[in-house]
Amino acid sequence: MILSHRYTLIALAAAILSSGAHAAGASVTASWGNVAEPSLPADSAVCKTLAATITPVSGSIDTVDGNPSNSQPDASRIQTAIDNCPAGQAVRLVKGSAGESGFLSGSLKLKSGVTLWIDTGVTLFASRNPADFDNGVGTCGTATTSNTKSCNALIVARDTVGSGIVGDGIIDGRGGSLVTSGPNANRLTWWDIAYLNKTKGLNQQNPRLVQLYNGSAFTLYRVTVQNSPNFHIVTTGTAGVTAWGIKIVTPSLAYTVPGYKCAAGTTPDKVTPATCFTPETVKNTDGFDPGQSTNVVLANSYISTGDDHVAIKASGGATRNLLFAHNHFYYGHGLSIGSETDGGVSNMQVTDLAMDGNDSSGGNGLRIKSDISRGGKVNNIVYNGICMRNVKEPLVFDPFYSTAKGSLYPNFTNIVVKNFHDLGSAKGIARTMTFLGYEAKKRTNPLTLTLDNVVFDGTQPAFDVAHNGGPASPNGTHFTFGGNGPVSFANAIVTSSTTDVTVTGTPGTAAAVDCSNAFVPLKSVAPTSPI
């Protein structure tokens, strides 16, 4: 009976997302089969329509909820609509009769088979009252010495089957707004609190925006997610996640200026409360983080944020079968695996990725990171068709991510980078690469890496220096040249039995990947973007 109910919910969810008039018919091919583009629900599949009552001004509603007693006026009616909605139907948030476009809520819980549809021009704003997210620990909205998490996410889906969040509207976490209760009330923004991790080594207790716990068949479609106080979208133990056409923009124009050209002395590294934010100063704002999850797709999406664009994690459980197809990344710390890999990460494909890092000081490209406190097997990872520019560290394979101690040894094997073209830096910033296996403490876990048609324009990147107790790069790396295309830095690789660096094969002569049409301005698809 339980299994029958589970598959009924999946079927109902499939019906709601395929019966509308917006189906595009596109699909991507994953290792486990074709994955079709979702669609918006049909009008007949809407169980409840809720109209907005708040009018934002320049993307802000801070004048509405200065009094914490009015911090989540829409939470009850949205939650009631979700609770009363039958499986296979959607709750739709729309504009009000006079053009009102804002909803304001604390933490919400999705249920199985129900889709939250945020309509075009509508924004679901998160409360800035930490009490609306506190999970009972009592420290949400502060920075603590304890790493115990104390905030619920804005939207939580726990053990759901066939749920989703769709629409051309926005979910806004308001990370740059002052919190309104607790010891930091009217003193610090969420992002100021997060910056205390850097300045004082404290753990910020800030809410995420979307958090999945277990469950299956979850859909994110076309929605914009921005200004999260912490991570934007996290899946934990979820089987089957499709994120298609989403946009992650942090900070948005509501909290910065065009081009992120903040005036001196206005950012959280210089003043609190800060009045202007850049990607470099909004800490721990990962974009899309699949953890301990399987059959995950991120396709045709756009991400610009202050931390990892993507962080694939495997903490205590495996993550496998992932596809990243036709995506555009901007500011951020890379398409990352790790740092938690002890459960194992395997079978991941990245195809047709454009990365424009805007010469950010913390910019990373393709990245696998771990250390002996949380390391494990990372195997069968293929990056194919990558266009990159203005990224400080384009290729990073690093098992010495930190100096933490332990006996969980990183092991990166069967990594393939092919049809990769880096156009260099508009500002002439020097690039570095890291190629390291874990060969220490009587362990020999070489990085096994195939390079084929990997081309850097201009001055070739340098190899990274020794850090965190590890050796200088390259070390413990077994290179294979695929033979179809060139490897522009091949002559810089020195084989040595001392460093356990080997090379098999020879580069080919195929033309570099054509990146002339790869890059698009983020604001052309996400109007709230400053770039």
Curated annotation (Swiss-Prot):
According to UniProt, the reaction catalysed is: (1,4-alpha-D-galacturonosyl)n+m + H2O = (1,4-alpha-D-galacturonosyl)n + (1,4-alpha-D-galacturonosyl)m
Gene Ontology biological process terms, A to Z: carbohydrate metabolic process; cell wall organization
Q: What class of enzyme is it?
A: hydrolase
Q: Active site at which residues?
A: 307 (proton donor), 333
Query: Per UniProt, what is one GO molecular function of this protein?
Result: polygalacturonase activity
Give GO cellular component annotations, separated by semicolons: extracellular region
Give me the ranges of the annotated region Required for PGA export across the outer membrane and catalytic activity. Answer: 518-531
Cite the InterPro entries for this sequence: GH28_Enzymes, Glyco_hydro_28, Pectin_lyas_fold, Pectin_lyase_fold/virulence
Q: Name one Pfam family in it.
A: Glyco_hydro_28
Q: Which E.C. number(s) belong to this protein?
A: 3.2.1.15
Q: Which UniProt keywords apply?
A: Cell wall biogenesis/degradation, Glycosidase, Hydrolase, Plasmid, Secreted, Signal
Q: Where in the cell is it found?
A: Secreted
Tell me the first and last residues of the signal peptide.
Answer: 1-23
Entry function? Contributes to the wilt disease production on tomato.
| Family under the similarity heading | Belongs to the glycosyl hydrolase 28 family.
Oligomeric state and interaction partners are given as:
Monomer.
- The name under which this protein is listed is Polygalacturonase
Instruction: List the taxonomic lineage.
Output: Bacteria, Pseudomonadati, Pseudomonadota, Betaproteobacteria, Burkholderiales
